[in-house]
């Protein structure tokens, strides 16, 4: 295939998927700059392998690459800092409920990286559990367990916050 066609296909993919990938990276990392860097790294990996992956649906593969990069970055950061990540301060949902978005971000920050990824892919990206298992390269039952455990951790924090806000 000619380079122009390849580049044109990738540009279309980039326009459609880059904003979604950056939002996912932001939710996973809590840091806008790190999210942008990791998104670009994921897109570079996608571009270099574009001839190999473009015939399949590249979107799930891009999410998998991004999640793996976020996990690696998180591990490196934890080795360096030895402290918990801070919740994102600029996450606002569509209705502009800043406080609620910050509460959710703070609650998500107590989850492990993999649990956070499973929750975000399930509820933020509206993916099915089999799709999540494929993206994260984990057995389906493990993804189900990760989701259940994550929700068990989140439920008390978010239910208490809902009661406090009333």
Predicted segment positions?
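Helix-turn-helix DNA-binding module
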Residues: 109, 113, 125-142, 153
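C-terminal edge and immediately downstream basic/flexible tail or linker adjoining helix-turn-helix-like DNA-binding
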Residues: 2-4, 9, 152-166
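A short pre-motif secondary-structure segment
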Residues: 118-122
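Structural recognition of an alpha-helix C-terminal capping motif at a helix-to-coil junction
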Residues: 37-44, 48, 56-68
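Arg/Lys-rich amphipathic alpha helix in sigma70-family domain 2
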Residues: 64-85, 97
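C-terminal flanking helix
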Residues: 18, 22, 43, 112, ...
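DNA-recognition helix of helix-turn-helix
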Residues: 67, 136-160
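A short, charge-rich alpha-helical start-of-domain segment used by transcription regulators
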Residues: 1-23, 33
């Amino acid at each position: 295939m000619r380079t122009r066609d390849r580049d044109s296909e990738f540009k279309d993919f980039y326009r459609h998927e880059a904003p979604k990938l950056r939002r996912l990276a932001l939710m996973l990392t809590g840091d806008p700059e790190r999210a942008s860097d990791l998104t670009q790294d994921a897109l570079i990996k996608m571009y270099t392998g574009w001839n190999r992956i473009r015939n399949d649906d590249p979107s799930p593969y891009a999410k998998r690459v991004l999640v793996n990069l976020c996990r690696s970055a998180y591990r490196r950061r934890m080795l360096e800092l030895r402290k918990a990540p801070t919740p994102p301060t600029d996450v606002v949902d569509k209705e502009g409920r800043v406080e609620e978005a910050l509460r959710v971000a703070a609650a998500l920050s107590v989850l492990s990286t993999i649990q956070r990824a499973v929750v975000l892919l399930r509820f933020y990206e509206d993916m099915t559990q089999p799709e999540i298992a494929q993206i994260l390269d984990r057995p389906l039952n493990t993804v189900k367990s990760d989701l259940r455990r994550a929700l068990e951790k989140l439920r008390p924090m978010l239910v208490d916050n809902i009661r406090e806000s009333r």
